[in-house]
Amino acid sequence: MSPNTGESNAAVYASSTQLARALYGGDLVSWIKHTHPGISLELQLDVPVKLIKPGMSQTRPVTVVRAPMGSGKTTALLEWLQHALKADISVLVVSCRRSFTQTLIQRFNDAGLSGFVTYLTSETYIMGFKRLIVQLESLHRVSSEAIDSYDVLILDEVMSVIGQLYSPTMRRLSAVDSLLYRLLNRCSQIIAMDATVNSQFIDLISGLRGDENIHTIVCTYAGVGFSGRTCTILRDMGIDTLVRVIKRSPEHEDVRTIHQLRGTFFDELALRLQCGHNICIFSSTLSFSELVAQFCAIFTDSILILNSTRPLCNVNEWKHFRVLVYTTVVTVGLSFDMAHFHSMFAYIKPMSYGPDMVSVYQSLGRVRLLLLNEVLMYVDGSRTRCGPLFSPMLLNFTIANKFQWFPTHTQITNKLCCAFRQRCANAFTRSNTHLFSRFKYKHLFERCSLWSLADSINILQTLLASNQILVVLDGMGPITDVSPVQFCAFIHDLRHSANAVASCMRSLRQDNDSCLTDFGPSGFMADNITAFMEKYLMESINTEEQIKVFKALACPIEQPRLVNTAILGACIRIPEALEAFDVFQKIYTHYASGWFPVLDKTGEFSIATITTAPNLTTHWELFRRCAYIAKTLKWNPSTEGCVTQVLDTDINTLFNQHGDSLAQLIFEVMRCNVTDAKIILNRPVWRTTGFLDGCHNQCFRPIPTKHEYNIALFRLIWEQLFGARVTKSTQTFPGSTRVKNLKKKDLETLLDSINVDRSACRTYRQLYNLLMSQRHSFSQQRYKITAPAWARHVYFQAHQMHLAPHAEAMLQLALSELSPGSWPRINGAVNFESL
């Protein structure tokens, strides 16, 4: 049950050992027996999924199946449909992915299930087909008459379908949410299946249809391809091996010498490639997929790369390659069932804008058979965070089964789970939805846990264990035999390893980027580039700087940051946006819509779609506070070399005032769960959370002050929203100019800022000596806010209008569409609409 829908399962949401297992249905059998005994429960142990044939006495209107990957769920569905589909039966299949839709229609056709149409092939926008497969985002295209008349609703991968409600591509959230809820409430026959069906979903269906109308199948069969598989999480990436092979340094020209090294990700990969093995490699990031493919190319040219920059190919073609490298573009709906690959390697990098662990888990299961039944995994924790803002919430359930976590660990993490639960209850309260608001806890949990290395590994291990995959910690053995202290030591080693190789990885990625000296896009792309520049940038930007901007935008996280910077500047220029939601909404939709031209490392242009957030009220509240902070600190990212210096006391004052509200707002907007200062700023919590998340040096450092906590919160928000780096200033005086380069006017300005009489000083030397005698007046700690290089070209402040007439004119044109009543009325202004 969702934390905001009742208390029958409330204890689970306060248990750091039970939480992950419950969210992915590990406790479903006991929960149904205890909470909904009226539901028909069928256990299918160690046999593939089998659905009750239509018309049999045990049949109920709603069938829910929880079964691991590879358990035959879709095969059982096809058999059921072959018996159920009479000429007059209508069926709606709701899919979570475009690729899944294509796979389903192919399997339906192969099984002789005729009459199905997909939304991809429909020639009409509004669809009323009798048998339709539609992706959730396009559900609003199904006619109202058809929605109310379907006999059968099929939700294969139902938890992924619900998860799509939170996707950035979900443009019509309220309409789609309402339609799916209507289908669940009214459709006469429902089949819902997933590997992670949980109590939240059962509770929803029970409330809509009644326990007596639900049959739940819990299957434990995982298939030989999974149940015999071992996943070893390696301690070290082996960055030295990667560098040696890619750069081919003279002392290691012969890569065959690498076979003598063992234990790291790249050492083991090289060894298997040298032995002639076929290898599939999963990468959670685009950049690593290209890097590891470059490494493999030293050993073989038979490589297939599947990522967002390369075309997909038919899964049957995979058998023609020795090495398959893929990202999360290969997910549910695509399965490779041949015994071709010997081993799987997996590189997983938890980060706020990357795939969550459920998406990773689903992608790991696409190759059904491995000849050696081994997965070698490296988890790169370089983008995860520790205190004072972030704390792990989870304690590993598998370890808790054999060993006892220390009571202090349990008490503190349970308290953190309760705080997270309360923050979820306060999130999206203005959302006029049924399903989106009900399942928000699971979504927020999956996204927020990406900030924690320990939580990410605990979730992934929970999911792998549900598929009977044994997880082994490198150098320690199966996780079932690992003690809490050993587990935390392993997390520490992983974090240390990732931090040690982070700079080297950045260098390798930069080496792979091509240095473009010329670009001349034409036609459609040239028009898009012109439109983008006129909308966002100042006219003074030259061609070389344009290239840098477009290359920066190839990184997905920089795209929303540029949009946010433009929106913040507009809110400062047009203060009415901070008073009237309609004005802000128009500004937001002006900048957060359309396309970005991006320039990849090969020098090719492509288009990236800008996504609009559904919860604009929350965005408005966040930008109101950010605009106030930016104005108070006089932050302008497009001046003075993108660097602004501010006093730490000014930051502290602002965040004492706005910190609590900002923490809730970034939770909703950034999916970032900042630990409350009242919880983290005490010694037991500070030491325990550092120990659990592998930050052992935190255990011996002093507890941060509230002042330091506020600085860290400011640094986080400005970095994540606008791409700015906040660092301590080491300069003697404010400003970006070094002391020896100060001009006479600069000296006068600095002296005036501390109200020192300089009337007796006429020469530069006199002013300089006077300033140096007053240097103690500038001893207060300052921070530098360094905006990204592209920010200097974004139209931000009104005094730059002469440099950006197009940007200002386009925004004013958009604002002219607002009615007079949308603008705030202040100081007794007349409401002309009422006259």
UniProtKB/Swiss-Prot annotation:
GO terms for biological process: bidirectional double-stranded viral DNA replication; DNA replication. It is found in: Host nucleus. GO terms for molecular function: ATP binding; ATP hydrolysis activity; DNA binding; DNA replication origin binding. GO terms for cellular component: host cell nucleus. Residues 54-215 form the Helicase ATP-binding domain. Gene3D superfamilies: P-loop containing nucleotide triphosphate hydrolases. The keyword Glycoprotein does not apply. Keywords: ATP-binding, DNA replication, DNA-binding, Host nucleus, Nucleotide-binding. ATP binds at residues 67-74. Pfam families: Herpes_ori_bp. Functions as a docking protein to recruit essential components of the viral replication machinery to viral DNA origins. In the presence of the major DNA-binding protein, opens dsDNA leading to a conformational change in the origin that facilitates DNA unwinding and subsequent replication. Homodimer. Interacts with the major DNA-binding protein. Interacts with the helicase/primase component 52 and the polymerase accessory protein. Belongs to the herpesviridae OriBP family. This is Replication origin-binding protein. It comes from Varicella-zoster virus (strain Dumas) (HHV-3).
